[in-house]
Structures are given as C-alpha cells and as structure tokens.
C-alpha cells in the first residue's frame, strides 16, 4: 500500500529535532582529535569531532531534507533552517577548517574510515537544497585523483560555490590517500563485511564527485585497481550467503544488493552485476529487512530507486568468478597454536 499520507511526519520531525539537540554526534569511543590518543571524557561542543557516526548522521539529515523538503516547509520554514545550521556547524565547518586523521596526510596509512566519512560528507553537502543551483556552476577539478594541482574556481563565484569547490577538492584528495594504500588486486584487508564500508563507500564518493562535476571522474571507473576493488566481493564469494572469511569478518557477510550492482555497472563488469542481482533476488529485494545496510537512509533510497531494475534481471546465467579463486593446501602438518 502506498504511503506518503503524512502520518509519519510528526515522528520524523521528532527524530530530527532529537538528533539536532544531541550534544555531540560522535561515538564516545571516538571522542579525540588525534589518532590513537585517549578519548576525552566529554565532548567539546565548540570543536565537533568528525567520526564515522557524526558523518553518517549528517548524511541522514541531508537525505531527510532532500526527500521531504516540501513537506517540512509546509509545516515550518524553520525545520530546514535547523537542519542546515546543524550541518554547517557540525560537518561542513569542521571539515573545511580542521584536520582529522582519516582525511589523509603524506604517507599516513588510511582505512575504510577515509571513504566512509568522505562519502557521507559529500552526501551532506550535495543533497541539501543549498547546493542544487550552485553545484551546476562548479568547475571540474584539475587534478584527477593524482598530483597536487590547485582547482580552478569559476569567476564571480558566491561564497557557497567557493565552499562547495573546497569540499570537492578535499574529498577528491582523501580518495587519493585511500587508494594509495589499496593493493592493485583490490583486496579488502578487513574482509567481505568491510567491503561495504571500503570499496562501496569509494564507489559512493566517486559517484557524487562524478555527478556534480558533469562526469569528470568517469574514466576512473575504468582503472584496473578500481575495477578490482569492485569485483573483490565476487572473488571471495563461496556459495549462497557464504564468503571466505579472515581478519574479524564473519563467513556470513550479508547479501549483496543495489550498491554492488551499481558498482558493477559503473566499472563495466557483467559478472558482478549478475552476482549482485542474483543475491538481491535471493534476499527478496531487501526492502523490509536489510541485514547489510540497516537503517542507512541513503542506501535505502538507492534500493528503492533501483529495486525494479534488479528484480527484473535475468539471473539464470552462470558466474565465472570461481575460476579466479586458488586455494592452496597448507604445508604445515599441525595447526598453529
């Protein structure tokens, strides 16, 4: 049955205002400003910490504003004002004026935090109403995930365009730092479960960058390293819902779905698309229960927007990924204690 009758709006607004009234958005275990230092006992409200949870909270509010701008304004124009104020103060301003380790610097090793946070900062920025008109005036970055050339700014820009351009530049730079630590084989060092927070978040960040720059980053989806990052999840798949597991990854890493499918399309890999569509159908479309993406609103949006496309895919074909997997017998006669 179709909804959109307004009966959930009060609860949605209560949730939004509860989030906006929180003292801080970061997880207590992440309440520090320097990598691998002790956490502070209480948050400093004048210096927001940008961790995984803060960045994802920003993206959640931006998604809500994107989907329900008209409905919010029908209640009060101050709803969007409240959301915008919180996003500027807790996400955009610290992103542009502070340095957090996951943003990348020199040879410091990066991990999934880099693209996970970067994707959500980009969503926070470009899903909000303030960016709709301005983003069409952005110049494409001179640099393409390499080098240190500055960005050209369009002439006679407003402060908003300059801000968006700075965010675009910094996000592209962080993707550089993430890719420098990834092997050419595309292997996710933390296993199949973290592929969703590493490889797929790289895809998410690249997609936003590509969209707002009129496909400036399109050729990057053809890079061998990026293609290998995309197909990693297929190459470690065993059967049904089981994967080769290592590190702290479970052998049951959750069903593949829309994001894997879209990454496969972007990188031109039919096997990955077939695998994702087949797994999506096996999970009955993941609209009600999504064991991988949980309550992430943006991922749910992607599922809704592409649901029919995946459910209509002919998945009777045979996957060829098993030919890529080589298993060696251990040479050690006894188990390692």
Please report, for each region that a protein language model flagged, where it lies by residue:
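Carbohydrate-active enzyme catalytic cores, enriched for enzymes
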Residues: 152-153, 197-324, 328, 333, ...
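Aromatic-lined, polymer-binding surfaces characteristic
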Residues: 1-137, 145-237
